[in-house]
């Protein structure tokens, strides 16, 4: 059980340090509480809004924090459930008479479901060869590679189903007969349709197979990416920003394990940096897409979906980013990452 003090963060900590601590604790909230006195809270959502306002990772977290947090007194603990539900928050601090945090009540601990429901279609890219997962994919198509007791594609669908999605379409090609057989025989509370790709068309090209069939905005996902996010909030963000496409991106922090040398003129050294640290956003391979994109796909064009987005961006269309924390993204596109995903899911059980 996590200790209250483990969720405290200093107001002078950087936003990057705060993100790391959120990842380390596995929580979505931290508290600015000098000597235990509650001053502010900081959530992954607060940080997301901060970045979208132009904030940077090296700024102190007090620039992103919420200094009007909700709380309950020790005698008001019984009101926690209704407050968590009414305000759709993940946690509520309990304060004594001196304003010191004595406990934290989590929504999941009270079995409070604050997820926003979103009933829109989900399209899954499931036709690739999965060459990075060879030799597994010599026997099984990537969507059917097991992670624990379920294939990865089924795990992904279950995550979307938890938020109200029940209409799935898989764009299939490689070993498509195995994929169809599995999902047709699976006992499930959602529908799965298939679009047959006769030649490999890239992660974007297969969308042309859905012309005339997609009438509403939809989630578009790889078959090897598992996100621990609020899909309802993502969809609301997409609508409120008026995006044609919203790309879900994860914050990544990477330390180069070597000294980096910048080359100057005539073989001279212009600069040296020992094990530099890099911070960037990376594409998770999950998107919210307007149906217009499908109708405007060129028949037979072989293209990756990031290139489709870039084409719209250059044309002046509104394409956006929904940032999430690194720990919210699990990718099994490579063997090493597949094993990491398995271990992480085992720890969550």
Residue map of PLM features:
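A short, polar/charged loop-to-alpha-helix boundary motif
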Residues: 46-62, 108-120, 281
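Short acidic/polar active-site loop segments enriched in Thr and Asp
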Residues: 28, 90, 166, 216, ...
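A short, conserved acidic/glycine-rich loop-to-beta-strand motif
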Residues: 241-251
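Bateman/CBS regulatory modules and CBS-like beta-alpha motifs in cytosolic regions of diverse proteins
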Residues: 1-21, 25, 31-34, 38-39, ...
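Conserved N-terminal catalytic core of the sugar/cofactor nucleotidyltransferase
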Residues: 52, 70, 118, 150-223, ...
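N-terminal nucleotide-binding beta1-loop-alpha1 segment
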Residues: 106-139, 145
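Catalytic-core segments of class I nucleotidyltransferases/pyrophosphorylases
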Residues: 218-219, 226, 232-239, 252-255, ...
